[in-house]
């Protein structure tokens, strides 16, 4: 009898343990599902914020989508892990969010900017940094660094602070080169769209305005190696009018 009770007690303990394991597994699935939902909502919120900036500059079309895809691709080419690539895919499209604070008279002016107007335009990186710095989340922190530094140049000729070399965060350097590539490939009222080959020639060899010295050397090398994928991304998310 005692032996039977012992067996029943052991079976009861085993069933309890299995029930606890099943409950824990169910909780983990629920938490995982919740986390996926939060991440999806977070990504959509970031996309909405980026789109809000682009409404100030409607010529850009699919630009914000391409920038994220380019940046993630380039991060992968540089050996970044999956999490880092996903972070910059979400963060890089926010690079121009500071334009929401730029007056339309300056931002949408069709002719060349005056010195005073260009000085106003050059404030948008700092405006973007102020907007994005309200959050301490890693993606937002990265986005704030990108917004502030994506117009800096490796040789120190950029703005707003004239940083050079390793003073510039690598995520900003990645965004810089993909932003230049996309601008070269895109049609604008003041210029035609360039082919992939033409854009690569300007980035790698320079054209007077753009120089290889503007770009972080390891980022430039990785970009050259990943250029076919960059071309594919552009073709996949091409502006409707092109």
Q: What would you call each of these model-derived segments?
A:
Residues 2-47, 58:
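Amphipathic alpha-helical coiled-coil "transmission" helices that mediate dimerization
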Residues 15, 33-37, 43, 50-242:
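Metal-dependent catalytic cores of enzymes that make or break cyclic nucleotides
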């Amino acid at each position: 009898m005692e032996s039977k009770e012992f067996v029943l007690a052991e079976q009861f303990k085993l069933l309890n343990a299995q029930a606890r394991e099943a409950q824990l597994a169910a909780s983990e699935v629920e938490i995982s599902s919740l986390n996926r939902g939060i991440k999806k909502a977070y990504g959509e919120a970031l996309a909405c914020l980026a789109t809000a900036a682009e409404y100030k500059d409607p010529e850009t079309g699919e630009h914000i989508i391409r920038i994220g895809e380019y940046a993630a691709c380039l991060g992968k080419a540089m050996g970044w892990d999956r999490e880092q690539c996903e972070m910059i895919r979400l963060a890089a499209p926010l690079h121009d969010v500071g334009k929401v604070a730029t007056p339309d008279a300056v931002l949408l002016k069709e002719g060349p900017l005056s010195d005073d107007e260009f000085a106003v335009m050059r404030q948008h990186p700092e405006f973007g940094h102020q907007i994005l710095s309200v959050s301490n989340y890693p993606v937002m922190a990265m986005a704030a660094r990108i917004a502030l530094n994506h117009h800096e140049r490796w040789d120190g000729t950029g703005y707003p602070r004239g940083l050079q070399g390793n003073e510039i965060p690598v995520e900003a350097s990645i965004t810089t080169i993909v932003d230049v590539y996309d601008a070269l490939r895109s049609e604008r009222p003041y210029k035609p769209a360039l082919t992939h080959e033409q854009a690569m020639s300007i980035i790698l060899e320079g054209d007077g305005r753009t120089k290889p010295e503007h770009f972080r050397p390891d980022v430039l090398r990785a970009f050259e190696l990943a250029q076919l994928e960059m071309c594919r991304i552009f073709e996949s998310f091409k502006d409707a009018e092109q």
